[in-house]
Regions:
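Short beta-strand-centered aromatic/proline hotspots
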Residues: 258-270
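Active-site-proximal loop/helix segment associated with metal-binding centers of metalloenzymes
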Residues: 86, 95, 111-186
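Conserved beta-sheet core of the metallophosphoesterase superfamily
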Residues: 62-64, 82-84, 169-234
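Beta-strand-turn-beta hairpins that frame and shape the catalytic cleft
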Residues: 1-4, 105-115, 161, 215-220
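Intrinsically disordered, low-complexity, charged/polar segments
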Residues: 280-309
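Core catalytic region of metal-dependent phosphoesterases/phosphodiesterases
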Residues: 2, 6, 11-108, 181-182, ...
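Mixed-charge, Lys/Arg-rich low-complexity intrinsically disordered regions
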Residues: 235-248
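Active-site environment of divalent metal-dependent phosphoester hydrolases
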Residues: 10-14, 39-44, 67-74, 105-106, ...
């Protein structure tokens, strides 16, 4: 069995379809962990197209609670059961889709993981003005926080993984360009920060911020899909980071031992190279150690490239 983990989907499941179609043969014992804002309970409907898409997968989905979705215990079709050692919410019609209960600890081949869902919606005022769904209990309340803290105390503040939607303040990406940045409620992040200072953990996985960032002991995931506990990407399907005409520095050759710089000539669309883990680029450039005429370097993967400011 295998365990994969990725960030927000917002009902766009192309990255999961690519994973199953091109990169991994998924089985009924495999699990994909989705770190909130999955897009299944956004309207609170008990039957919708998105659930049926995921129900067609052979594997399990463990969904962490996001801020843009109704909590399962408010929806009549959900039941509870014990799954991988912890309590989850599920619908009998879609048994392979389970929602983690905040504060529950789950077992993944001997590795323990705790789930902590919820976050503040930075667009809360806009949603209230326009009538878009907004959920008053989007952030963990005092009861949830106590449950999380008690569970962690039961394991002597030692856990392998944390699965959350938002993150401790120390890992929070800067968002000063966001309108009304100073009005964002950071109480959940501050609470998580106090937990992180005391907790002995291997990796803290989170989503919410729509980016992919690797920290020493934490990972922010969005388009990127990783195997649980592993540093390398299984797949990264999403926005190309670089554009045609942009100047970049890149590595190439055996073990990426050679360096070059040049201009992006072509972006290989996702699906053009379906067997690849992430987007790649054709670059017209020059090797750093042997300046001369420009050469076309084909299919340079995104992780080998850096922008030249």
């Amino acid at each position: 069995m295998a365990y994969y983990i990725t960030g927000d989907c917002h009902a766009h499941f192309e990255k999961l379809i690519w994973l199953a179609r091109f990169n991994k043969e998924l089985g009924k014992e495999d699990v994909i962990i989705l770190l909130g804002d999955v897009g299944l309970n956004y309207f609170g409907a008990d039957k919708d197209r998105e659930k049926k898409i995921l129900a067609d997968f052979p594997n399990y989905f463990l969904c962490v609670q996001g801020n843009h979705e109704e909590r399962p215990y408010h929806i009549q079709t959900y039941r509870t059961q014990i799954w991988n050692g912890g309590e989850v919410y599920y619908e009998p019609e879609f048994p392979n889709i389970v929602f983690a209960k905040d504060g529950e600890i789950y077992d993944f081949d001997g590795k323990k993981a705790i789930a902590i869902g919820g976050a503040y919606s930075r667009d809360k005022e806009y949603r209230l003005l326009t009538g878009l769904p907004w959920f008053p209990d989007e952030q963990p309340n005092d009861e949830v926080k106590s449950r999380v803290e008690n569970k962690l105390n039961e394991v002597d503040l030692k856990i392998d993984y944390v699965f959350s939607h938002t993150c401790p303040l120390v890992y929070r990406p800067s968002q000063k360009s966001v309108i009304n940045f100073e009005k964002i409620d950071l109480s959940t992040e501050e609470w998580m920060d106090e937990i992180a200072k005391k907790l002995d953990y291997s990796q803290w996985y989170f989503g919410h911020y729509h980016d992919n960032i690797q920290y020493i002991n934490a990972q922010l995931l969005y388009e990127e899909i990783k195997e649980l506990g592993e540093p390398d990407s299984v797949q990264k399907v999403g926005r190309p980071r670089y554009r045609v005409g942009e100047m970049v520095y890149f590595t190439f050759g055996k073990e990426d031992a050679r360096e070059g710089y040049g201009t992006v000539e072509w972006v290989d669309d996702y699906g053009t190279l379906g067997q690849e883990k992430e987007v790649s680029y054709d670059i017209v450039g020059i090797p750093c150690e042997l300046p001369g005429e420009k050469t076309l370097f084909k299919h340079i993967r995104e992780y080998k490239i850096q922008s030249i400011d």
